[in-house]
Amino acid sequence: MDSLFIIISLVIVILTTIFILSNLLSKKTILLPGKTGLPLIGESIDYFNKLRTGINEKFVMERKLKYASDVFKTSILGENMAFLTGPEGNKFLFSNENKLVQVWWPSSVDSIIKKSHNKSAQAESAKVRVLLPPFLRAHAIKHYVSTMDSELRQHVADFWVGRDEVEVCPLVRKYTFALAVRLFLSVRDPGELEALARPFEEAAGGIIAIPINFPGTRFNRGIKASQRIRKVIGGIIEQRRKDLSEGKATPSQDLLSHMIVEVDRRNAENPDIAPATDSDISSDILGLLIGGYDTINTTIVFVMMTLVEYPDVYDQVLKEQREIAASKAPGELLNWDDLGKMKYSWNVACEVLRLRPPTVGAFRVAKTDFNYGGYTIPKGWKLHYIPHFTQKNPDYFPNPEKFDPSRFAGDGPAPYTFVPFGGGPRMCPGNEYARAEILVFMHNIILRYNWEKLIPNEKVVIDPLPRPSQGLPIRLIPHKA
């Protein structure tokens, strides 16, 4: 009996030990290196401090070195969050979109871009993206180039010609917003344009604000501004439906017509699903306008700032643009083939995008538990990548603070190291649109002007995207005929 008791006891001890060890090993794979910091606050203070000083890549590098790991945990915006670093991490996130991870946005996005059926903006984003290819892919952008050029020529005539000095930031915002509204909504009426433009910046600012909805806060102002914009767009949709029914508008004339027709078709084909409404279309249009607004504005502004700081680069861009202009008849508008010849100009823009990424990066959420780097990322955890980490990393871009457009000549950077537009299925659907608009702007301004900064040492502030603190006032120096 005693020996049986001893055997049973040993078996229990062995099984218990195995259970404890296996549990510990399991936890070891779940518990990522890193810390989540204070409750609710987490490590948000350090993250945003580095973001505002333009060194948010150091937030990643410090922890990567501290934990000797390519993956670590933290807590930002009150969320448990994993960082997958380097090109390998970028590739993993991009290639597993809609498999292991899916898009996630902070709650501020849902508050600004509100849907009628209370579904989150990220839950709807995939549906919206299905509607975009006919209008934002390369084959469609080909037809926009001449319109972009025509609109910009008129903008320059209205706001640049005859002026000795201009402030770049507000002029770039005015042009890019007016162009987007023209192409997406066919809006040209100055009254409608002003009704959309006036509250737009507050709505865009609310997206990236701390989500505290008290009167007077940036977030609260953003919500109210978005409501005003959606009301204006709602009126445009109502009139467009009438025009479509009377044959005064066509389903293919712009993004709005296409979305109306496509949404109506899907509602009819899926009667058991809550139908999308005109309010949803309005929110989707608002989201698209906001989505591309800062990317293009930031890049154009810093191209302008950079070219004045590097005269040799300016001279090479001017030479390239003059060669293109010389190949065209007087008054002839730019076309898609012309943009393909602007190789050095685009290398310059890419180097600006590398040094001044016009985004803080992107967020994902784990759809299921998955393994990465020997650790398990739990379902529901958020993931974050920032382009700054690879784009300003000397391992991938030697002497990373040096402005050097030649980095993008030939084969260019290694895969997944230059990611200003994301990658994989979530590649920014407007990247070709942004490329075209940036190059058309460079062509028109550089052919007409050189310039000098009125504030030579104007600081760059980041809130949370980079911008010249005083709006980049410049003195225009027209080229001699």
UniProtKB/Swiss-Prot annotation:
The keyword Transmembrane applies. Heme binds at C428. InterPro entries: Cyt_P450, Cyt_P450_CS, Cyt_P450_E_grp-I, Cyt_P450_sf. GO terms for biological process: biosynthetic process; sterol metabolic process. It is a single-pass membrane protein. It is an enzyme of class 1 (oxidoreductase). One of its GO terms (cellular component) is membrane. Its cofactor is heme. It is found in: Membrane. The chain crosses the membrane at residues 4-24. This is Beta-amyrin 16-beta-monooxygenase. It comes from Platycodon grandiflorus. The gene is CYP716A141.
